[in-house]
Amino acid sequence: MAPNVEDMESDLPESEEKLEKLVAPQAAPRKYQIIYTNLLTFGYWHIAGLYGLYLCFTSAKWQTIILALILNEMAILGITAGAHRLWAHRSYKATVPLQIILIIFNSLSFQNSAIHWIRDHRMHHKYSDTDGDPHNASRGFFYSHVGWLLVKKHPEVKKRAKTIDMSDIYSNPILRFQKKYAIPFIGMICFVLPTIIPMYFWGETLSNAWHITMLRYVFSLNSIFLVNSAAHLYGYRPYDKNILPAENKMTFIACLGENFHNYHHVFPWDYRASELGNIGMNWTAKFIDFFAWIGWAYDLKTASDENIKSRMKRTGDGTDVSGQKYSCESSEVLQ
């Protein structure tokens, strides 16, 4: 996620035998230690982004706005198709050319290096909505959305980071390269080039180019952050009513198909992250399917219809994939 880096991980995990079992939802009392540099940085980014939004309606060239829209989608795909579904969950495999594309897209998103993002996300699934979860939604919307990046990590997060197996990630030279050269590589791709390109090719002003880059950046940040916050607090739970993650329609467009969060936490290894596959606006699944078609993505993992139906009947909240109620006695829960 965005800058709150503490090198807690090693490539090989330590034993969990001496650690207390955490049960969600959990939010034990704690003292928050604000990281003021992060607070000021996030504040500047958002103020600059709001000014960029103003410039879109007053002086920015249309080409600059179109470029920002395109780069925003690429940045989100760098998280959803790259750090999330490919590397964190290994829900499919990718050839080197596709991994290079995804690491460039991921750098556009600048939510720390992909390695840090993957570690935090694996912790999020292993200790979801407990004090071992870096963005514990049990602490409320603001904390899970961005507050966790503005304070020092919970002691449980620091302890349990050492239990996360990252050996597959550290054996990937593409991911190691991005982490090793994070400041120049990510800085160039996320901020410098998107500012220079409009100035060079169509004569945009520095102020317009920079502030619209900030707008694009904070929009992509908050789009992904909604999965941590809104999709853990609001929505319906067709697959498991006993967990916080929910199917949340408000995050549908912004997150390119990451809104089926109840499904994802039940079947995290499904590359579609949704029972609906690439139907509708699950653009991440469409992206992966395209590269599977040309042979750059392969070994795509999916949950079987039988497993999905069985889980819905056993632990679901009585809604179907669209959020409508169905009869638990019915043999057909999916339409």
From Swiss-Prot:
The keyword Iron applies. One of its GO terms (cellular component) is endoplasmic reticulum membrane. It is found in: Membrane. Belongs to the fatty acid desaturase type 1 family. It is a multi-pass membrane protein. A motif (Histidine box-3) lies at residues 261-265. This is Acyl-CoA Delta(11) desaturase. It holds the Pfam family FA_desaturase. The chain crosses the membrane at residues 39-59, 64-84, 98-118, 182-202, 213-235. PROSITE patterns: FATTY_ACID_DESATUR_1. Residues 321-335 have a biased composition (Polar residues). It catalyses: an 11,12-saturated fatty acyl-CoA + 2 Fe(II)-[cytochrome b5] + O2 + 2 H(+) = an (11Z)-Delta(11)-fatty acyl-CoA + 2 Fe(III)-[cytochrome b5] + 2 H2O. Its cofactor is Fe cation. The keyword Transmembrane helix applies. Catalyzes the formation of Delta(11) fatty acyl precursors in the pheromone gland, with a preference for myristic acid. GO terms for biological process: fatty acid metabolic process; pheromone biosynthetic process; unsaturated fatty acid biosynthetic process.
